[in-house]
């Protein structure tokens, strides 16, 4: 009987090991494919010209492949979305975890879950039909499809991730911490923000980094509201193009060096995501220490 149990445990262990190796293999395959496909264009164009060139004209008679506008747009767009989405998401999470009644928490929790379930094209469609014309009318600009529209859409899209993960982190704080703070004379608000929030810091940091990853990797929604012009993002009302949308809009008809350059853009985006994951691990390890 014991031998059969050990055999079963070994089989289960082997299955999980294989599944884990498959996951690792997928990451390695994607990494190798992007590197192999993206490096040739960087070699031909030149790393400096590719990363810091301000003009992208892939279909011109004399093509130019500078992706600095895409890089800056992705950075500005993500930073703007985080600047708007993190405070709203964080304060909402504190309210749901510490202040809201069970009924309010259930209703708002369901609303957050529904917001998370809306597909990217849904956000993009609402932004294109409502937000873009609204920006055009309110700010009296020729076209509302802009960096500002992209930031607002991305800020809304990252809210569910930030709220859910932050609520989970705050609810995981031992109740004894709060009881001790209250016993020492602290108010509930002081306890929430000076005891519970620092104790849940690693989870909240993970939520923010996840939001950054969601924002920088989004393509469909921003493609519908950004304008998709390869301009330097010198204004919130400028029609712009992100790293993701640059690949998505041109890949279908690309060929030759243009296609290789798009893979190079994907490689740059992949490195951005890896950097974000490294930052997440740094925060988590620092919190554990």
Annotate each language-model stretch with its function.
Residues 167-171, 175, 182, 249-289:
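C-terminal transmembrane helix and the adjacent membrane-cytosol boundary/short C-terminal tail
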Residues 222-270:
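Interhelical loop and adjacent transmembrane-helix boundary motif
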Residues 165-166, 188-224:
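Transmembrane alpha-helices
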Residues 1-68, 72-75, 263-289:
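N-terminal, non-cleaved signal-anchor transmembrane helix
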Residues 119, 184-185, 198:
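Glycine/proline-centered hinge or cleavage motifs at structural transition points of membrane proteins
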Residues 67-95:
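Transmembrane alpha-helix signature in integral membrane proteins
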Residues 113-155:
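Generic hydrophobic transmembrane alpha-helix motif, especially the helices
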Residues 13, 88-127:
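Cytoplasmic-entry segments and transmembrane alpha-helices of multi-pass inner-membrane transporters
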